Amino acid sequence: MEGRMQDRDIAIPQLPARSMERAAAFYRGLGFDFEVVSPNGDYAIAELGSLEVHFFLHQSLVPEQSSFGCYFRVGDVAQLYAAFSRANLPGAGIPRITALENKPWGMCEFAIIDEDGSLVRIGQEL
């Protein structure tokens, strides 16, 4: 994961993972590069194009009770929705993917809930 953006200030979300192996499989299935970067295996970085998310080990997390989440604002939400849809996530339960919709707050967006219950919204301005 060389060449990370270091020429500007950015905020990077951190999400919990009960298992780095399962998180890696899930996010790789969406097209992310995923690398465990800590020697003891409790921290990882996933990247997809300019999107970056970090993961910390949280083995006692209950996915149905998780309040973790993040929002990615992207330039082409329809393209990313099509790519994520190829992972064949269900429309209900954990994990899942929601429909791509125009929202009253001026965004076209969808969401995924990952295997650890984190809500990841992805949107583009209308």
In which residue ranges do the predicted regions lie?
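Conserved active-site alpha-helix within GNAT-family acetyltransferase domains
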Residues: 21-30, 110
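Acetyl-CoA-dependent GNAT
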Residues: 58, 97, 101, 124-126
